[in-house]
């Protein structure tokens, strides 16, 4: 099994370019099967394991998927041969549930095995099912698969009981070809929700209000292929911003939308780091001590849960006490035991992590327990004295393209073995 070996203690310096957003791409690719005419050419697609998995699922439906280069895919879904998405690829990733909305919209039926992803807590799809049923679908779950069908889909008002990115996107996809208008209330506002809406509109959909908590989708007769570029990855950018601060380095992160990073920038500034925004870049550097801060994860525009774990690593060597409250996922502190192996002083109480900063971490053999915990471990290795070995890095590969190569470009001593 592959692992990462890091010889820590070097400040990161230089510039790095951010890829397209994982969280947008993994919804856009399933949504591409809505196009009954023409082909979708999608660029700025991150070269990650989750995308490769989706490519295989789309091919299994009978679609033609051509890789034009490492970051560009051409998808022709004119002739889909099955409405069943089953098998190991479907089961092992959460984003496969977007095939439910896409197949339901286009064919009025689907069978999709229940997905997995990162082991960070219960990920129910009750809000998805509630929305599909409101549109007129009948849903059953049997033998680990969602079976769904409808004579027709009729637009309606859907109020989400909780803010859910997955449910917002899935219902947005499903409603594109419904009769009449669908209104999604208490919708998620994340940048990748907006990006999926923009992609749907590029195919001919009529989606308005994405980025607010009320989204209106007026159904159309058909969707067609289009050319589209995936939005830059807010989470990858945030991870490199945090790594720059943690190593007390000086890094310019390019191909970003600074507005999407404001909650992260605000916390870094509060700690004492310097953040300079350009039109499509952010520079992070440190020229003094960093102090502890308190933070609470929240739906966008709040502090993103997906960079909470890397932030925990940064705070582990900041002066004073910090408290992180995780409000999105109930089991997203698995990285803490790994950080403690490296000398961090952290106590978990329920959804809170109480961190007392130490002067330094020391290298150890640690495990990437999930995707973002893996990023936290990489940053921990970069700031530690000695050698760190990270195992289970298949989790990291799900969301960070060629992570060791990017950090090497910034001067890190990191190799994959």
UniProtKB/Swiss-Prot annotation:
The active site is at residue 118. Keywords: Cell cycle, Cell division, Cell shape, Cell wall biogenesis/degradation, Cytoplasm, Peptidoglycan synthesis, Pyruvate, Transferase. It catalyses: phosphoenolpyruvate + UDP-N-acetyl-alpha-D-glucosamine = UDP-N-acetyl-3-O-(1-carboxyvinyl)-alpha-D-glucosamine + phosphate. The keyword Ribonucleoprotein does not apply. Its EC number is 2.5.1.7. SUPFAM superfamilies: EPT/RTPC-like. The modification 2-(S-cysteinyl)pyruvic acid O-phosphothioketal is found at residue 118. It is found in: Cytoplasm. It is an enzyme of class 2 (transferase). This is UDP-N-acetylglucosamine 1-carboxyvinyltransferase 2. It comes from Clostridium perfringens (strain 13 / Type A). The gene is murA2.
């Amino acid at each position: 099994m592959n692992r990462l070996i890091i010889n820590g203690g070097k400040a990161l310096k230089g510039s790095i370019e951010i890829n397209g957003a994982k969280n947008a791409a993994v919804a856009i690719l399933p949504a591409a099967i809505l196009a009954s005419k023409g082909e979708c050419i999608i660029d700025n697609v991150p070269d990650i394991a989750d995308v490769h998995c989706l490519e295989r699922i789309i091919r299994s439906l009978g679609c033609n998927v051509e890789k034009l280069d490492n970051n560009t895919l051409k998808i022709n879904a004119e002739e889909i041969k099955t409405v069943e998405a089953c098998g190991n690829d479907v089961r092992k990733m959460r984003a496969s549930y977007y095939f439910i909305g896409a197949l339901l919209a286009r064919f009025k039926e689907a069978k999709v095995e229940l997905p997995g992803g990162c082991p960070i807590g219960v990920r129910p799809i009750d809000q998805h099912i509630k929305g599909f049923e409101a549109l007129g679908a009948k849903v059953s779950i049997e033998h680990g698969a969602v079976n769904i069908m409808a004579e027709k889909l009729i637009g309606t008002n859907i109020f989400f009981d909780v803010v859910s990115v997955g449910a917002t996107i899935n219902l947005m996809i499903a409603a594109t070809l419904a009769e009449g208008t669908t209104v999604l209330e208490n919708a998620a506002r994340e940048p990748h929700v907006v990006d999926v809406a923009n992609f749907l509109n590029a195919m001919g959909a009529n989606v308005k209000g994405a980025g607010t908590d009320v989204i209106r989708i007026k159904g159309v007769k058909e969707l067609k292929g289009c050319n589209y570029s995936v939005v830059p990855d807010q989470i990858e950018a945030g991870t490199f911003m945090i790594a720059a601060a943690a190593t007390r380095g000086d890094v310019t992160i390019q191909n970003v939308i600074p507005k999407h990073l404001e909650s992260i920038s605000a916390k870094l500034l509060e700690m004492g780091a310097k953040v300079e925004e350009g039109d499509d870049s952010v520079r992070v550097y440190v020229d003094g001590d960093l102090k502890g801060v308190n933070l609470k994860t929240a739906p966008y525009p709040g502090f993103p849960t997906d960079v909470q774990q890397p932030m925990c690593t940064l705070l582990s060597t900041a002066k004073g006490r910090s408290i992180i409250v995780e409000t999105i996922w109930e089991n997203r502190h698995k990285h803490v035991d790994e950080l403690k192996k490296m000398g961090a002083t952290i106590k978990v109480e329920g959804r809170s992590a109480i961190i007392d900063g130490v002067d330094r971490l020391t290298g150890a053999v640690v495990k990437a327990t999930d995707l973002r915990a893996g990023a936290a471990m990489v940053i921990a290795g970069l700031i530690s004295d000695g050698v760190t070995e990270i195992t289970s890095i298949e989790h990291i590969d799900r969301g960070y393209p060629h992570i060791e190569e990017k950090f090497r470009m910034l001067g890190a001593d990191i190799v994959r073995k």
